Structure formats: structure tokens, C-alpha cells
Amino acid sequence: YSADFLLENLKIEINLIESSFKNNVRRLLFLGSSCIYPKACNQPIKEEYLLNGELESTNEAYAIAKITGIKLCESLRKQYDFDAISLMPTNLYGPGDNYHQTNSHVLPSLIRKFSEAKKENTTVTCWGTGSPLREFMHVDDLGDACVFALEKWDMESNNAPRDSKGKPLSFLNVGTGKDISIKELALIIAAEIKFKGEIFWDVTKPDGTKRKLLDVNKFSELGWESKIDLKEGIKKTLGSYENEIITKNLRI
């Protein structure tokens, strides 16, 4: 439903950004996504790779909506001096995530698989070879990064992050700067859940992009870095997962 998806996302962000502008909001932070970048990017992915290649077809509608939001913020700043900035987060996880069996992201999907397999004393089958590398950041780190950006990132200052041509960047990547293979991720989750059964890898299923890691050096130059390591974040997320089951608030 790419048309519906694109229409809804464009309406939401345009309404919010335009309303913020018209009502003299002092500063606006727009959140994009790492899917804005071309599917065949060099790694790690720098901000200036935006619009340098073809988008991943499965995420195209979402990516176009996010790119539109970035460019609208840029245009309002340029034409009207509206103070709007944007952050591009890496893959997020944490409390309130989506644990649906077919449309959840890889980390919450693995949490559900291993949790249910432990309770039912069954095996776990994961897609692909497990070799692709991905970056994951806890949502609490993103919250901290957003506050930091609003308080510390001044695009007009002499030390504002710039692209290779010396132009101030209007959006910055935010992440951990570290990636991990899907197989390693699965083993960490299995260990935290204390799953003792067998794990199989269905190599007939696609692996997807081999690596996707954001270059977060520009945001790091401002003095921010992630604080929650992956094992700690997974442990916290497992606690919220169990609590959401008990309180019947789990998104499935």
C-alpha cells in the first residue's frame, strides 16, 4: 500500500512542520531514518550520500516521505530562517516495540521467537545465513540524543558539523557507530533469555543488504555518544517485553 503509506506520512509531517513554523516554534527537531540513503551505499554511511543513488524498493515510500521532511526543514530555514534541524537514527529497539510475527524488525522478532521457543521447548529457525551486519541503538539513547541536539547543535556556529565541501549539515546521523552480525545478535538474545534449544538458519531465505552502518562522526564531534551497550539494552528490553505481556500492552 505504498500510495496510502506515502500520503499518510507526508500529511503527518507537513502538518506538523508547517504548524510549527506558522506558530513560531522556537526550534524544531525532525526525525528521519537511515532508510533515506541509497541501497548501495559505501560503508559506513555518511550524510552526504543522500540522493546519490537508487533507494531500496521495499522502503521507497517511507524513504521519500522522510527525505521530503528533511528538505522541507532545510527550505524553511533557508527562506524564512526557521530553526529546524533533523536527525537520522539507526535501527532502534526498546520498550513499546512491535513484536508482530510477520512485520516486526529483526531484534524484536528474535526476542519473541526465542521467548516463545523457550516456553514451548521448541527449536528456533532464523532467516538467511546470519552474516549480515546491522547497527542497533536503544530508544533511550535516541531520546538523549534528541535533547542534546536541541540544546547543543547550532548550525550557525563556527564549529557546526559540515560536509566535505565545508557546507553546514542540516541533518546528522545518530547511532552507536558499531555493528553486529545477525547471528551474533541471535546468540546474545538466546543467552539473555536462557534458551537452550537448537538454532537453525534457513539459507533459502534472503539475507538482505550485507552491511548497514551509519557514520556518526559528525554528531560525535558535538560531544554526544551512545551510553547503552547492546547487551544492557537487550536485557532492559526483555524486561519491558515481559511486562507488556503481563499488562496486555504488547504490540503483536
Task: Enumerate the language-model features and the residues they cover.
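Conserved catalytic-core motifs of eukaryotic protein kinase domains, centered on the activation segment
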Residues: Y1-D4, K39-P44, G96-Y99
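Hydrophobic positions on the long internal alpha-helix
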Residues: I12, L16-S20, L72-C73, A145, ...
